């Protein structure tokens, strides 16, 4: 089975300063995208199935491509060295509404459902939402 434990639901707003509350918009760029930092920590493999290697393979095989097809900008992917069962992603979207649309269509995609079934990896997922500062080189 596929299980996810979400550390932060519902997520905070993110994106350009104009769509944020005054308290959140301070120092945020007007042209900032919505950035999402994701930590996926895989549970150990059981009987040779699941685990971090299956998670990496799922990402390699199709998950990243599918997210891009649905509109996500996949900025970078990292392997944590202090916890090798954790993969870190940085994604970007036009704004929070766009992010929610991307994930809604992605989660309903039959290719994603088949891929998730093929590589059923229980994970702990942590999500952090950010907006670029007005002096950031990446927006």
Where do the protein language model's features map onto the residues?
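Short, surface-exposed beta-strand/loop patches at domain edges
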Residues: 113
